[in-house]
C-alpha cells in the first residue's frame, strides 16, 4: 500500500520550497503590514531558516535548527493581522507557482497551528 503524499511532496519537494520562500519574502518585504519586522534581518539567513522550518512543518525532512516559534518571535508584539498577512503572502506565492487551491488550503491549515506560538498566546 502506498503511503499518502505529504504536503511538502504535493508542493514539489525541495526544489519547490527553494523557489517559494524567496518569492514569499519578496512579497512580505513589500507588505506594509509586516515588512518592518524584517528591517534589520539577514534575509539570506532568514530565507534558509524559513525554508527549513516550512519543509519540516509540511512533512519534509527536518533540518530546522532554529528556535521554537514562541522564542523566535518573543517581544515582537505580533498580532493576528500580522500572522494573517504572512499566510496571505504565502498563499499568493504558492498560487503564483501553480499550486492548487486544495494544497494551499492544506498547507494553511497546518501553518495555522503555529499561530498561538508565534503570537505568544
UniProtKB/Swiss-Prot annotation:
User: SUPFAM superfamilies from the xrefs?
Assistant: Globin-like (SSF46458)
Provide a Gene Ontology MF annotation, just one.
oxygen carrier activity
Instruction: Name the UniProt key words of this record, in alphabetical order.
Output: Acetylation, Heme, Iron, Metal-binding, Oxygen transport, Transport
Q: Which InterPro entries does UniProt cross-reference here?
A: Globin-like_sf, Globin/Proto, Globin_bac-like_CS, Hemoglobin_trunc, Hemoglobin_trunc_I
**Does the entry annotate any disulfide bonds, and if so which pairs?**
none
Source domain of life: Eukaryota
- Record: residues binding heme: 73
**A Pfam family reported for this protein in Swiss-Prot or TrEMBL:** Bac_globin
Keyword Transport belongs to the record? yes
Co-factor note (free text):
Binds 1 heme group per subunit.
Cofactor(s) listed in the protein's UniProt record: heme
Q: Which residues carry this modification: N-acetylmethionine?
A: 1
What's the subunit arrangement here?
Answer: Monomer.
What is the name of this protein? Answer: Group 1 truncated hemoglobin
Q: Which organism is it from?
A: Tetrahymena pyriformis
Amino acid at each position: 500500500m502506498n503511503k499518502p503524499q505529504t504536503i511538502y511532496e504535493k508542493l514539489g519537494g525541495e526544489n519547490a520550497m527553494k523557489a517559494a520562500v524567496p518569492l514569499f519574502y519578496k512579497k512580505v518585504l513589500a507588505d506594509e503590514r509586516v515588512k518592518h519586522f524584517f528591517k534589520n534581518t539577514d534575509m539570506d539567513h532568514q530565507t534558509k531558516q524559513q525554508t527549513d522550518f516550512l519543509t519540516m512543518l509540511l512533512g519534509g525532512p527536518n533540518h530546522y535548527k532554529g528556535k521554537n516559534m514562541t522564542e523566535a518571535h518573543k517581544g515582537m508584539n505580533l498580532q493576528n493581522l500580522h500572522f494573517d498577512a504572512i499566510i496571505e503572502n504565502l498563499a499568493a506565492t504558492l498560487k503564483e507557482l501553480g499550486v492548487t487551491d486544495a494544497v494551499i488550503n492544506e498547507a494553511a491549515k497546518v501553518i495555522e497551528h503555529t499561530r498561538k506560538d508565534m503570537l505568544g498566546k
